[in-house]
Amino acid sequence: MWLVEANGTVIRSYLVSGKYRTPAAGTYSVFSKSRHTSAGHDGITMNDMVRFARGSRLAIGFHGIPRDRYGRPLQTEHDLGGFRSAGCVRQSDGDAAFLYDWAPIGTTVVVLH
């Protein structure tokens, strides 16, 4: 993933995990943010959620590595870079916090496959 300023300067790049071809390639816009949220099932929680697309049931966004009801991570940062999610884009917790602070509502998101 690349974080790119309006002038084209890449300010940060890093590995993420997502779901194959989800969301569809295209241009989106950040429409909602939450420091702490849940997946709505199984007690799974995520930090630094930045929502930019709509899924069939829930919004799709960037967030830190999800945790189960006991606080255990669902994957390690070492595992980032593969298909490991139900639709959202997982980042390291540090990268998720940076993106949360960097991207205000309305920020353009371009998804490539």
Positions of the model-derived regions?
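Cell wall/extracellular polymer interaction/catalysis modules
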Residues: M1-S34, T45-M49
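Exported/periplasmic cell-wall-interacting domains
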Residues: T22-P23, S34-H113
